[in-house]
């Protein structure tokens, strides 16, 4: 096997390569004077199962992935497998208004035209999986989160909305804790009311878990409500930590700690999904 490490996932790819007792492959990469990306893979990839590890969140990451897929066509590889820990554009999985693109569809069609399989971790919407021409696997970070918090004293695991209830129910069961979700009620097209259900959290230690922290609004509001109800300690965790516009500062006004996975590298990426990804790679490379 060969592990190709793209810029967005260097640390995770290095840890995966170390676990699998190999060295990550990196391209000769630079920018043309006009800003366009140049890359080249000069290591012989012939006969190997290739695993490209890199996110597809920013436009630059998308281009790096597409150019990598094109570049390695020169080698007679055994297989080409994309592992995008954070699969970008999955929020645009359908057309909401006329004239809009279905972004996740066109990108997935491109990726799957040049690969034998695709995998990601906790994709935002599973509709995107159906756009692939090859097998598209959605790995899950629940066990990684459980590994991190198994020795942390918490009383409840909390979902900031009912959409994440299945995730929180699984994590809480594995931790041997109770769980609940923050209730939401839409008042009008601009106003959503959030409230804590009939659960006594006074003096309790809570772990809030979500799939994505982007602007942090929902997590910040949830933390504030729980603090008002007397929670003594609030941990915040998520699979993907994007932290748009410094949203961690907003969250930490009421939360005590933030710990997210390393699907997106940040100073809060204390939880690793490398075991989940390694198991997936071993199944293909067996």
UniProtKB/Swiss-Prot annotation:
GO molecular function: ATP binding; kinase activity; magnesium ion binding; ribose phosphate diphosphokinase activity
Entry keyword annotation includes Membrane: no
Annotated keywords: ATP-binding, Cytoplasm, Kinase, Magnesium, Metal-binding, Nucleotide biosynthesis, Nucleotide-binding, Transferase
Cofactor: Mg(2+)
Broad class of enzyme this protein falls into: transferase
Enzyme Commission number(s) of this protein: 2.7.6.1
Primary residence: cytoplasm
CDD domains according to UniProt: PRTases_typeI (cd06223)
Binding site for Mg(2+) 1: 124
Reactions catalysed according to its record: D-ribose 5-phosphate + ATP = 5-phospho-alpha-D-ribose 1-diphosphate + AMP + H(+)
General function of this protein: Involved in the biosynthesis of the central metabolite phospho-alpha-D-ribosyl-1-pyrophosphate (PRPP) via the transfer of pyrophosphoryl group from ATP to 1-hydroxyl of ribose-5-phosphate (Rib-5-P).
Family, similarity comment: Belongs to the ribose-phosphate pyrophosphokinase family. Class III (archaeal) subfamily.
Record NCBIfam families: PRK00934.1 (NF002095), ribP_PPkin (TIGR01251)
Subunit structure: Homodimer.
The protein, known as: Ribose-phosphate pyrophosphokinase
